[in-house]
Amino acid sequence: MNRTRPLPEIKMVSANKTASILEERTGHRFLNLKRLERALTHSSVQAPARANYERLEFLGDRVLGLTVAEMLFEAFPEASEGELSVRLNALVNAETCAAIADEIGLADLIHTGSDIKSLNDKRLLNVRADVVEALIATIYLDGGLEAARSFIQRYWKKRSLETGAARRDAKTELQEWAHQQGNVHPVYAILSRSGPDHDPLFLVEVTVKGFAPEKGEGRSKRIAEQSAAEAMLYREGVWKRDGSA
């Protein structure tokens, strides 16, 4: 598996130059360059709290979820609520958002402080994912939902229409698999919680009686539990890396 792409330390790139680059890559003409700059600024930069991307990320996450849910609702009229939820989660998770950040080339435009180099691969992936969501919020505030929808469709539409069957929720899958191994249940435990309050990282361990435990990380307890469940499903051969079960 490829290691997460490192982020550069903060560098001086003019707001106009940044906007020009992103206008070409997003198809959107940015009206508020100060807000765009904020969307690209990590909290490690020594600046007032409102000068980083965190508030924009909050809004962009909601706009992305709504727009992708709408795309899936229209594209899969026969899909159940459960299948739509699985597809939605796969399309808005950190891995997908970070991959789109790489397509856009955002890593070279994100402003970070020197301490960003101490973050592990998972946290760096999360930074790139966060900036994509902040960028969505910037587009939304510039041009409304239609402008945000246009950008999201540009990068998410093809992914949303992939014909492969949606993979089931990892915790549900592990629960059923564990039951088949002798009527046992997975047990999840939080091993640690690190990072600031606004950007925590949870380390969770899952155990199934008779099997070695597995660990997973995530920005919430739920995501970390899913990550741990996925790790065990892959290790035990229940899931394959090609997406088959």
Curated annotation (Swiss-Prot):
Domain spans labelled RNase III: 19-144
Keywords: Cytoplasm, Endonuclease, Hydrolase, Magnesium, Metal-binding, mRNA processing, Nuclease, RNA-binding, rRNA processing, rRNA-binding, tRNA processing
Entry's localization field: Cytoplasm
Gene3D superfamilies (UniProt xref): 3.30.160.20, Ribonuclease III domain
Alphabetical list of InterPro entries matching this protein: dsRBD_dom (IPR014720), RNase_III (IPR011907), RNase_III_dom (IPR000999), RNase_III_sf (IPR036389)
This protein's GO CC annotations: cytoplasm
Gene Ontology molecular-function annotations: double-stranded RNA binding; metal ion binding; ribonuclease III activity; rRNA binding
Binding site for Mg(2+): E57, D130, E133
Enzyme class of the recorded protein, top EC level: hydrolase
Biological process, per Gene Ontology: mRNA processing; regulation of gene expression; rRNA processing; tRNA processing
Active site residues of this protein: D61, E133
Catalyzed reaction equations: Endonucleolytic cleavage to 5'-phosphomonoester
Superkingdom in the source lineage: Bacteria
PROSITE patterns: DS_RBD (PS50137), RNASE_3_1 (PS00517), RNASE_3_2 (PS50142)
EC number(s) reported in the record: 3.1.26.3
UniProt cofactor(s): Mg(2+)
Ranges of residues in domain DRBM: 169-238
Function of the molecule: Digests double-stranded RNA. Involved in the processing of primary rRNA transcript to yield the immediate precursors to the large and small rRNAs (23S and 16S). Processes some mRNAs, and tRNAs when they are encoded in the rRNA operon. Processes pre-crRNA and tracrRNA of type II CRISPR loci if present in the organism.
Family: Belongs to the ribonuclease III family.
UniProt-listed NCBIfam families: RNaseIII
Subunit structure: Homodimer.
Protein name: Ribonuclease 3
